[in-house]
Regions:
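Residues embedded in well-ordered secondary-structure elements
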Residues: 21-22, 90
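Charged, amphipathic alpha-helical interaction segments
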Residues: 15, 37-38, 106
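Sec-dependent N-terminal signal peptides
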Residues: 4-15
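Boundary at the C-terminal end of the N-terminal hydrophobic targeting segment
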Residues: 17-19
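Short N-proximal segments of mature Sec-exported proteins
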Residues: 22-72
Length: 124
């Protein structure tokens, strides 16, 4: 009986550990990574504040580190990001989508806003 309880308990703990990001959240995180990367590599003539480029790159790093923390494999994460980058490559700056992604990072990742601020400070 103890053996069965241990197995059930282990299964529950494993599932809770991976509950940090649903499939919808993962898709949104990948989309945001693609948008952020497109923001960083804007086509010539596109206006964009440098501080927003910093925040975009920091947000990409925070999203990836959080994904790895909660158990998403690096290969799975990178594959998803690459698809999103291909989708948004060369896109013009979209303030609404970018702000939506900032809101997502701040709400989906524990201390997301603070993590992004920390990474921005390390970019130099």
């Amino acid at each position: 009986m103890k053996k069965y309880l241990l197995i059930i308990f282990s299964f529950l703990i494993f599932n809770l550990a991976h509950a940090g990001m649903s499939n919808n959240d993962k898709s949104k995180a990948w989309e945001c990574s693609g948008i952020y990367m497109a923001n960083y590599f804007l086509p010539p003539g596109e206006s964009f504040e440098y501080s927003m480029k910093e925040k975009s790159m920091a947000s990409v790093k925070v999203l990836k580190s959080y994904a790895l923390e909660i158990g998403i494999s690096e290969k799975e994460w990178d594959d998803g990001v690459n698809k999103a980058v291909d989708k948004y490559n060369g896109a013009k700056y979209d303030k609404v989508k970018t702000e939506d992604c900032h809101t997502f990072v701040n709400s989906a990742i524990p201390d997301g806003e603070e993590r992004v601020k920390k990474v921005v400070q390390t970019l130099y």
